[in-house]
């Protein structure tokens, strides 16, 4: 369900309404400075740190030996050379899953930017980015990344936030693993446990978000900020069990309906919509953007708005430059956090200094 009801609010009028919607405006480096260096590599994270991002984002999945791995998907096919290194380890569906490999095995893989596979040919998703397979990046664990960030903070005397997305908890439950519990335990080990700490935990899985809020945070004596990421139902992002115990596609339609954001607000501090969910594309043009009803719904629910994902390569027709896109999101939709592959441009737009 994409846009079940329609309310139009134009930027000039809405700017006054959103003044209290967001606190400090912040930039999250989505998978690091992924527009410049392969996503989720240490090089990508250190570049984003230097560029002045407020937070570094991590996608977290589990290995066969229960180690948290930083990777953009629980499927290895289109980000590593797994098909060459372990050609017989795919499942019946033809995919190679992180959870079927140990940390030692995963360390043997070369990591690169996301790509499409046609036969034996690899085509980058974003053709003008860092060349595929050069110079030979590797996957790493979530704990290694936390240690890396702590090291940067120690040597520079400058802090940066952690923005951790728990990937497909439902899939990990199917595999008999509790990725949410392991993620929270590791965050607490490194001192990320209260609302005053520089940390957000995000997931698409609303059922798991409720479990984190009701069960896991009290269990670990934690109170970190939670973000519900929003998807369209036809993206097939999440599964849940029906009344017969069968796993079925999760229906996100209610999040786009009246009262949806109020329901989310019972468990989350904010929501993470795609920017396309906030703007009526067919009715928008340069200098005149029409906002979707989700914008006012988020404000009415007093939720933080964390918008995904701004990229040079995917700017809409109504935003000619990255600055125009940041302006629309921060000043018209009322977003207080924008996730981007180009954190330096977001930092510059907000008038914040780079760290180096």
From Swiss-Prot:
Glycerophosphoryl diester phosphodiesterase hydrolyzes deacylated phospholipids to G3P and the corresponding alcohols. Binds human IgA, IgD and the Fc portion of IgG but not IgM, which may contribute to evasion of the human immune system. Residues 25-314 form the GP-PDE domain. One of its GO terms (cellular component) is plasma membrane. It is a lipid-anchor. The outer membrane of T.pallidum has no lipopolysaccharides, few proteins and is a fluid and very fragile bilayer. Its lack of surface antigenicity is thought to contribute to the ability of the pathogen to evade the human immune system. Keywords: Cell inner membrane, Cell membrane, Glycerol metabolism, Hydrolase, Lipoprotein, Membrane, Palmitate, Signal. A lipid is attached at residue 21 (S-diacylglycerol cysteine). Belongs to the glycerophosphoryl diester phosphodiesterase family. Residues 1-20 form the signal peptide. PROSITE patterns: GP_PDE, PROKAR_LIPOPROTEIN. It is found in: Cell inner membrane. It catalyses: a sn-glycero-3-phosphodiester + H2O = an alcohol + sn-glycerol 3-phosphate + H(+). Immunization of rabbits with this protein partially protects against subsequent intradermal challenge, suggesting it may be a viable vaccine candidate. Recognized by sera from 39/43 syphilis patients, it shows promise as a diagnostic antigen. A lipid is attached at residue 21 (N-palmitoyl cysteine). The keyword Cell membrane applies. Its EC number is 3.1.4.46. The keyword ATP-binding does not apply. It comes from Treponema pallidum (strain Nichols). GO terms for molecular function: glycerophosphodiester phosphodiesterase activity. Pfam families: GDPD. Its main location: membrane. One of its GO terms (biological process) is glycerol metabolic process. Palmitoylated upon expression of a fusion protein with first 40 residues fused to PhoA in E.coli. This is Glycerophosphodiester phosphodiesterase.
